């Protein structure tokens, strides 16, 4: 995951979060801004990583209030810091070396024999003869070597140590210094008479002045003790809280060397961070256990513009997600900055928690906590059993509306509304349209529904609806398909019904008035409307609601006013339309290569390319060559070549220009290139083309009503092309088996019938149409198919012999009876 957060240093001292955000918002959209004023650094979050990169390029080394700022991509929290040794670390090394050198010079001067030698070299008038008697051994000489051995860490090394290591070294140094203090004769520690422990009064006095009996420290140690290590990261109150445990744990000075030394801190104890205290293992285990119970995550510190669709790619790689809910503020129509993610598998939720907690998302650091289980309002089965059975089914169906899958297709329409719409359009009554004495009333209704569906598709496509989205099973969370309402329902009626639940962004109803699409601004509003209005009675019908497919709208196309004269796509096809597809295939298969002959034998590939390069669509050119028998390794031109172009039209234009062109004193002859084939190959190609054209002419009709006859199928499919044959298989009792076949003359007619009738209902059943299995184009493919079928049959026979061998009947003791 690329970082969407930038690090800004060198900020003005009095800069605030709002001012930093306002400065970066002059060019980019900012999701978060945080300033640490004491350190003059800050962090700025952006919506995408591209915006963060552009912000670094634009704002780096610019000025804010006379302060030059540096902008760089922020590193993750768990990134390891680069170990480098700067000049500040190198300077103490040199200083320490110089100090050691000066100490050696001083020691040399303090040496007794050296002083005696130097005194002899001085003039007699400057020599004090009485000074030799008063010289005493310097106590520093006896302790200098011991102090050098007892020093565990150098001054410059302590800057690279952690807080725990420096504290441990200090404790060891104090203990070593106390061990060299001479024992005072007659000294006894003050103890309490009751239990023999040291007196608390004396202990308190020692704690009040811990530095009283310690030896004087060096200048660097004194300066380090007066300098805060927090560098302004914490407030004053936090600094006092942070420093109080350290003051309480200071060791008391030890006077007698026989007294036991205080133990240093255990190295196994983890050091506390200067900024934040890491959660303990018990807390982490508690969070994980809570997540395993609910499989639900509470995600906070989100941007106020975050949507469910943006969170799904982040959390979906860890497992199947049942629901993502972003909390919205109804007063300001913006997000509250937190969301809930419900997983189907608890292990997936735990994995997401471990990998995403503290990560950067849209410029903010994610904070993930375990969430409680979602509240569900279950029905009381005891109270529900007291109601009538019909009422029980209605309540259960309404309760399960949000999670149930519908058996009808997305473009399902009320049959009565379809017939009413068609009857009103042609100016007849519905009774005249459906003649009770006619046997093809079901076919008429199917034709009417097909006409209305085609009209609805044309209207939706004109208003920016992606019709291919209806083929996918994944559903969105913003749009709702409203179906099964009575004919005559107006757009205003649906708007009044859905508006109380939220802001409606789109409301589309085709001229037929049999289906509608309602789109909301927020997912929670759409969910609330779906739960409240599912199976509600509207007029003399019941509303059927279905969640619209995902990515239903292609673009933000404004809805067009429905025109009364809007017509459906014409279903009539002429002979030219029928064979248009074949002509298009020939156009695609046509060559875009030119054959060039009468070339000069001295013409090279480079000269031929230079001649054809200025032409539009030129790709390459080459001269056909052969090996030179007299000069091995060399080639000879054969006097012709080829030139390739991108399209056939460009090749035709080049042919008209270059035919008759003079190149190297030779007039070029340019023709369209054709691959040479023998008679058998040409015949094979023709047969293959015929089989390809005829392989998609047969349609298998599934979910066919048992009452449908062969005549009904012919009447329904015959309106879209000329049928070669219609077959409806029957059982032994002459009843239909529920499927049929329709074979068209051309593949274009079969495709048109498939596209028009794939959402049509016949006698209340939706027709499921598929192309029948294609016949083998090549004889080799047919042979392989037959061999595979025979092999499967032989395997079944062998399996039957193996499993049936142990089922033979046998008589126990038959031989004994015969004897």
UniProtKB/Swiss-Prot annotation:
<dbReference type="GO" id="GO:0000480">
    <property type="term" value="P:endonucleolytic cleavage in 5'-ETS of tricistronic rRNA transcript (SSU-rRNA, 5.8S rRNA, LSU-rRNA)"/>
</dbReference>
<dbReference type="GO" id="GO:0030686">
    <property type="term" value="C:90S preribosome"/>
</dbReference>
<feature type="region of interest" description="Disordered">
    <location>
        <begin position="80"/>
        <end position="223"/>
    </location>
</feature>
<dbReference type="GO" id="GO:0005634">
    <property type="term" value="C:nucleus"/>
</dbReference>
<keyword id="KW-0677">Repeat</keyword>
<dbReference type="InterPro" id="IPR012677">
    <property type="entry name" value="Nucleotide-bd_a/b_plait_sf"/>
</dbReference>
<dbReference type="GO" id="GO:0032040">
    <property type="term" value="C:small-subunit processome"/>
</dbReference>
<dbReference type="GO" id="GO:1990904">
    <property type="term" value="C:ribonucleoprotein complex"/>
</dbReference>
<feature type="region of interest" description="Disordered">
    <location>
        <begin position="242"/>
        <end position="281"/>
    </location>
</feature>
<feature type="compositionally biased region" description="Polar residues">
    <location>
        <begin position="115"/>
        <end position="132"/>
    </location>
</feature>
<comment type="function">
    <text>Involved in pre-rRNA processing.</text>
</comment>
<dbReference type="GO" id="GO:0005730">
    <property type="term" value="C:nucleolus"/>
</dbReference>
<dbReference type="Pfam" id="PF00076">
    <property type="entry name" value="RRM_1"/>
</dbReference>
<dbReference type="InterPro" id="IPR000504">
    <property type="entry name" value="RRM_dom"/>
</dbReference>
<comment type="similarity">
    <text>Belongs to the RRM MRD1 family.</text>
</comment>
<feature type="domain" description="RRM 2">
    <location>
        <begin position="295"/>
        <end position="373"/>
    </location>
</feature>
<dbReference type="InterPro" id="IPR003954">
    <property type="entry name" value="RRM_dom_euk"/>
</dbReference>
<protein>
    <recommendedName>
        <fullName>Multiple RNA-binding domain-containing protein 1</fullName>
    </recommendedName>
</protein>
<feature type="domain" description="RRM 3">
    <location>
        <begin position="478"/>
        <end position="550"/>
    </location>
</feature>
<dbReference type="GO" id="GO:0005737">
    <property type="term" value="C:cytoplasm"/>
</dbReference>
<dbReference type="GO" id="GO:0000447">
    <property type="term" value="P:endonucleolytic cleavage in ITS1 to separate SSU-rRNA from 5.8S rRNA and LSU-rRNA from tricistronic rRNA transcript (SSU-rRNA, 5.8S rRNA, LSU-rRNA)"/>
</dbReference>
<dbReference type="GO" id="GO:0034462">
    <property type="term" value="P:small-subunit processome assembly"/>
</dbReference>
<feature type="domain" description="RRM 5">
    <location>
        <begin position="697"/>
        <end position="774"/>
    </location>
</feature>
<keyword id="KW-0694">RNA-binding</keyword>
<feature type="compositionally biased region" description="Basic and acidic residues">
    <location>
        <begin position="200"/>
        <end position="212"/>
    </location>
</feature>
<keyword id="KW-0698">rRNA processing</keyword>
<keyword id="KW-0687">Ribonucleoprotein</keyword>
<keyword id="KW-0539">Nucleus</keyword>
<feature type="compositionally biased region" description="Basic and acidic residues">
    <location>
        <begin position="260"/>
        <end position="275"/>
    </location>
</feature>
<feature type="domain" description="RRM 4">
    <location>
        <begin position="592"/>
        <end position="675"/>
    </location>
</feature>
<dbReference type="InterPro" id="IPR035979">
    <property type="entry name" value="RBD_domain_sf"/>
</dbReference>
<dbReference type="InterPro" id="IPR034482">
    <property type="entry name" value="Mrd1_RRM3"/>
</dbReference>
<feature type="compositionally biased region" description="Acidic residues">
    <location>
        <begin position="151"/>
        <end position="160"/>
    </location>
</feature>
<feature type="domain" description="RRM 1">
    <location>
        <begin position="4"/>
        <end position="76"/>
    </location>
</feature>
<feature type="compositionally biased region" description="Basic and acidic residues">
    <location>
        <begin position="104"/>
        <end position="114"/>
    </location>
</feature>
<feature type="compositionally biased region" description="Polar residues">
    <location>
        <begin position="247"/>
        <end position="259"/>
    </location>
</feature>
<dbReference type="GO" id="GO:0042134">
    <property type="term" value="F:rRNA primary transcript binding"/>
</dbReference>
<dbReference type="GO" id="GO:0000472">
    <property type="term" value="P:endonucleolytic cleavage to generate mature 5'-end of SSU-rRNA from (SSU-rRNA, 5.8S rRNA, LSU-rRNA)"/>
</dbReference>
<dbReference type="GO" id="GO:0003729">
    <property type="term" value="F:mRNA binding"/>
</dbReference>
